Amino acid sequence: MALIIRAVAASDKADWERLYAGYAAFYKVEQTEAMRAVVWGWLSDPAHATEGLVAERDGALIGLAHFRAFARPLSASTGGYLDDLFVDPEARGAGAAAALLAAVQAAGAARGWTVIRWITAEDNTRARAVYDRLADQTKWVTYDIRL
């Protein structure tokens, strides 16, 4: 029944795909098997900046986090960017999201990063309740230029 947070491993591929497809479905983002294969390739390549963590309980994966370093020129420092955080809906409320965030925070602290940053949907109230306990909401507004 113990929760284990660890780096994603090659043997996690099927469970990771299930979780990542669930994450895409939650945000109503079309995601193909080929797209998941690209991300899995990144996570499997030690030379790629994107890293993956998983939350495991009773031998089953219940959550994932993807993160990477990013340059912060204005402060001449490096931060960590949390690209994805997802916990299986059946496993929510038991601390997996907080544990994944704590593991990303620990990785960043060990590397000398100055911040862990991420975005979430404004209406993602359940996740925001966790984030509001563990982090500070910023004043920044996000923009995209689609290419």
Ranges and model annotations:
Residues 4-18:
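A short beta-loop-alpha structural element at the N-terminal edge
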Residues 18-31, 73:
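Helix-loop element at the rim of GNAT/NAT acetyltransferase active sites that forms part
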Residues 31-52:
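Active-site rim helix/loop that mediates acceptor-substrate recognition in acyltransferases
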Residues 54, 60-68:
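Conserved beta-strand in the GNAT
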Residues 91, 95-103:
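Conserved acetyl-CoA pyrophosphate-binding loop and the N-cap/start of the following alpha-helix
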Residues 98, 122-141:
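Conserved active-site alpha-helix within GNAT-family acetyltransferase domains
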Residues 109-119:
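Conserved GNAT acetyl-CoA-binding A-motif
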Residues 117-127, 146-147:
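Conserved beta-strand-loop-alpha-helix junction that forms the acyl-donor binding cleft
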